[in-house]
């Protein structure tokens, strides 16, 4: 089981490297990694389990965040009522198209690998099309909007060596375009 002590923190070089693409069929090691990352997200969203193991809640976890420099990320995205609206493990994901219109979270973003609060809006495309493979090697392309699009962008950024605060406007952290959709 992945615990907070296993999460790589900001400053570790693996978080700033472009993750290596995986080949299929996935080895048992990478299949287990996918299961373990999803298990962390499920456990972290269960208040009793999270408290018992001192887990910070997460909606996404990329392989580099657990020290594995490979292109894989687990996502478990709830709606504002806590119901799961998107659950997937991406292998070798790419955002192949995105909307011009941006969206962001009203409270900004956080990250399991970043221990401090970094204030500011993190504008991301409101709609994205993600091309990826499943753990079983099935090729997929999906369109996402709103919160699932934000989480997908955050995790895919990890796979490209970027952290959420790289997207915050340095001069005015709370500046937004007029038509940016602010959610939650």
UniProtKB/Swiss-Prot annotation:
Q: Which residues form the active site?
A: 155
Q: Which InterPro entries match?
A: Peptide_deformylase, Peptide_deformylase_sf
State what protein this is by name.
Peptide deformylase
What GO terms are given for molecular function?
A: metal ion binding; peptide deformylase activity
Q: Which Gene3D superfamilies match?
A: Peptide deformylase
- Which portions of this protein are annotated as coiled-coil regions? none
Q: Keyword Lipoprotein, does the record have it?
A: no
Instruction: Name a single GO biological process.
Output: co-translational protein modification
Q: What gene name is given for the protein in this entry?
A: def
Chemical reaction(s) catalysed: N-terminal N-formyl-L-methionyl-[peptide] + H2O = N-terminal L-methionyl-[peptide] + formate
What family classification does the UniProt entry report for this protein?
Belongs to the polypeptide deformylase family.
Quote the EC number: 3.5.1.88
Q: What is the species listed in this Swiss-Prot or TrEMBL entry?
A: Lactobacillus delbrueckii subsp. bulgaricus (strain ATCC 11842 / DSM 20081 / BCRC 10696 / JCM 1002 / NBRC 13953 / NCIMB 11778 / NCTC 12712 / WDCM 00102 / Lb 14)
Keywords of the record, alphabetical order, are: Hydrolase, Iron, Metal-binding, Protein biosynthesis
Cofactor details (free text)? Binds 1 Fe(2+) ion.
- Named cofactor requirement(s): Fe(2+)
